Amino acid sequence: MTLPSVSSAPSADGVWHNCHLLPDADPAHAIRDAALVVEHGRIAWLGATADLPDAYRGAARHDAHGAWITPGLVDCHTHLVYGGQRADEFAMRLAGAGYEEIARAGGGIVSTVRATRAADEDTLFAQAAARLQPLLAEGVTAIEIKSGYGLSLEAERKQLRVARRLGEHFGISVYTTFLGAHALPPEYAGRADDYIDLVCNTMLPALAGEGLVDAVDAFCESIGFSIAQTGRVFEAAARHGVRVKLHAEQLSNLGGAALAARHRALSADHLEHLDEAGVAAMAEAGTVAVLLPGAYYFLRDTNLPPIALLRQYGVPMAISTDHNPGTSPVTSLLLMMNMACTLFRLTVPEALAGVTVHAARALGASDRHGRLEAGRVADFALWRIDSPAELAYWFGRNPVATVVRQGRVHAHEGASA
């Protein structure tokens, strides 16, 4: 299915009626027999139909046919722009090959780096657009896209430019994250500190100066970068006034989450090996825990993130696809909601918050996404469901009817707006 570009989508202005509203993730805030008004691409009013102000009663009408309307979903951790795919590596892993064996055979992240460097921007755009479209069709209206498969200034710039282009073409809010400290490129083998010099002193200043960087991330693991090296990246980000995020505690506990908290990171992501000290540090700093059940499932991990501790300390939990070619080649945020409930034992309200209010917070965008509020840009989704709990209940089914992104209507099969 090819989704139209934003320029061809009709305006959502008018009164959306015959609907039920879930303004945020709290079921107690649900409004039945509701209406929502859009003016000039922004939400002007929402509430019970009986309370609709007289000023709007003559406006254009959009019959929701009994649908539930929620905020647009937010996918807050993706690696959507890259060249090629790694299905052969998947087959090797199923046959028992480990990370090092796959790397020696020319696979792993280096294979994606080669493909990404070789592809031009138009090719990367076409491939990423195909990956993005299923997410758009599931009601995603804001997405984070990381670099990290270029590992050179030119190739990282190319990834980030494509990410910006996706946002412009599809009318979706794209938040770009510079992940230059993702892996060591082949030309820097054995010289990790020299590569971090390049990331901090050349790549980041150039890309931030070009307006391509909304946040900075790093892969802090024994097979990635050390606490000291990650700290250098975060210090460089601070010099450029850019917030940070971190891949932390996925494979081991190096203390990455605590480091992220010291730098007031927006989020720490993965967290399968997070301990109580790290949880406490995140709680104090207000750092969001981004859970990535797709990678957990794909890697057949057995170490669960400490959900009970995250709840106990009040750490907000977001959920994301972590779309990437090596460990989470998934393009369904709804499936990740189901997996977060079934694998990580999140409640349905936690899952709903994880793809709305908490995901928006993980992007530093709580004022723009994750809630239905008057004054905000009209980003919302209409669902053919009897209860919002169905969004986490179904898997392999997309109950979306219509998606409104940036004040424009994108209708899907079976929908009428």
UniProtKB/Swiss-Prot annotation:
One of its GO terms (molecular function) is zinc ion binding. Binds 1 zinc or iron ion per subunit. SUPFAM superfamilies: Composite domain of metallo-dependent hydrolases, Metallo-dependent hydrolases. Pfam families: Amidohydro_1. Gene3D superfamilies: Metal-dependent hydrolases (3.20.20.140), Urease, subunit C, domain 1 (2.30.40.10). Zn(2+) binds at H77, H79, H247, D322. Fe(3+) binds at H77, H79, H247, D322. It is an enzyme of class 3 (hydrolase). The keyword Transcription regulation does not apply. 4-imidazolone-5-propanoate binds at R86, Y149, H182, Q250, T327. Pathway: Amino-acid degradation; L-histidine degradation into L-glutamate; N-formimidoyl-L-glutamate from L-histidine: step 3/3. It is found in: Cytoplasm. GO terms for cellular component: cytoplasm. The keyword Ribosomal protein does not apply. Belongs to the metallo-dependent hydrolases superfamily. HutI family. This is Imidazolonepropionase. The lineage of its organism: Bacteria, Pseudomonadati, Pseudomonadota, Betaproteobacteria, Burkholderiales. The gene is hutI.
